[in-house]
């Protein structure tokens, strides 16, 4: 599991190493006018919430850091990716079945439910892939090449021939 998540997050690192600060901050692409940096920050904030709540067993997805420097500067984004990857590498697979409480606001109020650590990591990974797909659209509109052919594709998505 960790290898798959790390491989996916490294796609983000490769993207950031190959774009300009202007491209990273660009918010001109309709319909959402979001930046690559905004998506990167959001993706990594979800993982960060997992690690912030790991010791207590209470993971709160509402309490994201929202570090604006991560949204504005590629080097800050790369550093955040590297911090999350380092924390992932420190996890033990024996802990994936550990029960944790996960709190989030689904739009009709705050809810707390039991997950396994593995379950919330899978959700964070799928969430990252989803946002990479959104980034794929922004990247395309900005005329930037994707880091690789799997960027933003869920492994279960059928490949077109």
What does each model-identified segment do?
Residues 5, 9, 36, 40, ...:
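Hydrophobic packing residues in well-ordered alpha-helices of helical domains and bundles
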Residues 25-63, 110-150, 158:
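Short, contiguous alpha-helical
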Residues 16-22, 107-112:
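Short amphipathic alpha-helical segments and their helix-coil junctions
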Residues 1-2, 16, 51, 135:
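A cross-kingdom marker of C-terminal helix-rich interaction/assembly modules
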Residues 8-18, 46, 80, 131-134:
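Amphipathic, well-ordered alpha-helical segments in soluble domains
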Residues 46-90, 94-110, 144-161:
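Short, helix-capping/interhelical loops that line the mouth of catalytic, cofactor-
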Residues 1-8, 31:
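Short, contiguous, pocket-lining structural segments
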Residues 16, 85-88, 139:
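Hydrophobic residues within well-ordered, non-membrane alpha-helices that form the packing/core
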